[in-house]
């Protein structure tokens, strides 16, 4: 049975036929970066949204432009209430963009052209629909109970700057399920 690639698979060493060399830690200084929003870049099948496969189809063009590194903002499974930064599942790709296999294929194709890929991977918060947050809400003493910051006192850390003052009144939001306030640094839906 074929296994589905996982996000951690990208951290494994190169195949044995490619001798490992310590990468130049300053490679980025002379690189041409290109930020690409998957949704807006190239729609290969007329659905109205770009895909990882569409991005892969255009790698030769990006290489021709002189791009050395693609910077891809979040493309993970998300309810998209914060531009994809509110990740529901770090191990899945947003279905409209493709699959994990599509991402693996993109990485392989980019590397064959000497193009690096970096991604935004916001691990300091999740979507409020993430399984960890839902478990934290319903089982304070469970495995995920302390994955988030909860309090009975919304004045705790009162001096902390509110980043989005136009939309958020506090860094704390009341949760009627747990009957406590949860801490968030951005919007209340990516917690």
Residue spans for each PLM region:
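Acidic/aromatic-lined carbohydrate-recognition and catalytic surfaces
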Residues: 2-191
């Amino acid at each position: 049975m074929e296994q589905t690639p996982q996000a951690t698979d990208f951290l494994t060493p190169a195949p044995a036929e490619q001798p490992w060399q310590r990468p130049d830690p300053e490679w980025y200084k002379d690189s041409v970066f290109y930020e690409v929003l998957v949704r807006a870049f190239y729609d290969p099948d007329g659905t109205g949204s770009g895909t990882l496969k569409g991005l892969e189809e255009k790698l030769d063009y990006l290489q021709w432009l002189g791009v050395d590194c693609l910077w891809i903002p979040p493309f993970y499974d998300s309810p998209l209430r914060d531009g994809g930064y509110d990740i529901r599942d770090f191990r899945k790709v947003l279905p409209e963009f493709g699959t994990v296999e599509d991402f693996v294929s993109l990485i392989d194709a980019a590397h064959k052209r000497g193009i690096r890929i970096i991604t935004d991977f916001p691990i300091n918060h999740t979507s409020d629909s993430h399984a960890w947050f839902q478990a934290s809400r319903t089982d304070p003493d469970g495995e995920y109970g302390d994955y988030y910051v909860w309090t009975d006192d919304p004045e705790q850390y009162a001096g902390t700057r509110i980043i989005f003052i136009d939309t958020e009144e506090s860094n704390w939001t009341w949760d009627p399920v747990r009957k406590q306030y949860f801490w968030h640094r951005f919007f209340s839906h990516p917690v």
